[in-house]
Regions:
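N-terminal Rossmann-like dinucleotide-binding module
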Residues: 1-50
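Beta-loop-alpha module in the N-terminal Rossmann-like domain of NAD(P)-dependent dehydrogenases
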Residues: 20, 53-113
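Short, conserved SAM-binding/catalytic segment
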Residues: 45-53, 113-117
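Hydrophobic residues in well-ordered beta-strands that form the structural core
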Residues: 96, 121-123, 228, 255
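Rossmann-fold dehydrogenase core element
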Residues: 109-126, 144-149
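Predominantly a Rossmann-like dinucleotide-binding segment in NAD(P)-dependent oxidoreductases
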Residues: 127-208
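Contiguous beta-strand/loop segments that form the cofactor/metal-binding neighborhood of enzyme cores
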Residues: 183-264
Length: 286
């Protein structure tokens, strides 16, 4: 397969799935062999470069007919475990958006299956390869120990964005959906092991089955502490909705918002979640 294009089946063609599909289309060495989504056959909004690709509404059918080498899974979180296992059983490598599963047991089952089949498993921790976030982490690692890490991402969503969030909350809470990124970042910043985690939450609406707000605290074995907060819904405040701040004995470093030329950043703008205007650094010696 080294001299041939990797045949990719894209499962889930929403915000993330569409982004990945467009990337596969542009990157040499990949060939998209199908798009799979429950409502894909009736869609007329796909970009021109994807519009003529084979479409499937059933994962089993898509795996059998498209015969992919790899599967890109970008569906709602409560399907990740099932679809990963199906892809491995079909002899495919897997890229899956976070979180890997909705339970620890489910995540372990996917990892075990990847090892048993000898296939690659890659999880979409985009911040691990984001240039600005890599620099943010590197700067944090120069601040000494312990670190105090303060992060949040609250989203004042309404209309289509609120519908999307409510659908996500059929699977899990905001603190799990988003928190996996930032706890992973905290682990990289400290290079330490978490020893204690606790959190609280609240359900601020009767339109969801789960809490739509929560915050967690993580303690590490080097004395560092981390805080993360996430809330979704039309009731959420946009005051300090994007905090990415790390403090150590030698100073602090922060990601600052909004973007250049703006006086305000919308909290429900998905693109703003990974954009950075600048890193603000401070030395305790100044």
């Amino acid at each position: 397969m080294q001299n041939e294009a990797v045949r990719v089946l894209v499962v889930g063609v929403g915000n993330m799935g569409l982004s990945h599909a467009l990337a596969y289309d542009k990157i040499e060495g990949f060939e998209i062999v199908g798009l799979c989504s429950r409502s894909i056959r009736g869609r007329n909004d796909l970009p021109a470069e994807l519009a003529s690709l084979p479409r499937y509404e059933n994962v089993d059918e898509a795996l059998a007919e498209s015969r992919p080498d790899a599967v890109s899974i970008n569906t709602y979180p409560n399907t990740h475990e099932e679809f990963c296992l199906k892809a491995f059983d079909a002899g495919c490598h897997v890229f899956v958006e976070k979180p890997l599963a909705t339970t620890v047991e489910g995540a372990q089952a996917v990892v075990d299956k990847a090892r048993a089949t000898g296939k690659k498993l890659v999880i979409g921790y985009i911040l691990r390869v984001h240039p600005a976030w890599k620099e943010f982490i590197a700067r944090a690692q120069t601040l000494g120990k312990p670190l105090v890490m303060r992060m949040n991402l609250n989203q004042q969503s309404r209309g289509p964005a609120w519908n999307w969030h409510r659908n996500l909350m059929e699977s899990l809470t905001p603190i799990v959906d988003c928190g996996v990124h930032y706890v992973d970042v905290m682990c990289q910043m400290t290079g330490a092991q978490p020893v204690r985690v606790h959190g609280v939450g609240a359900q601020l609406t009767d339109q969801t089955k789960v809490q739509n707000y929560g915050h967690l605290h993580v303690e590490f074995d080097d004395g560092s502490v981390g805080w993360y907060e996430a809330g979704w819904g039309p009731m959420m405040s946009e005051v300090a909705f994007f905090v990415k701040d790390v403090v150590g004995p030698k100073g602090c470093v922060s990601i600052v918002m909004p973007q250049e030329g703006q006086d305000h950043a919308a909290s429900d703008d998905i693109d703003s979640h990974t954009k950075t205007n600048a890193l603000l650094c401070h030395s305790s010696e100044i």
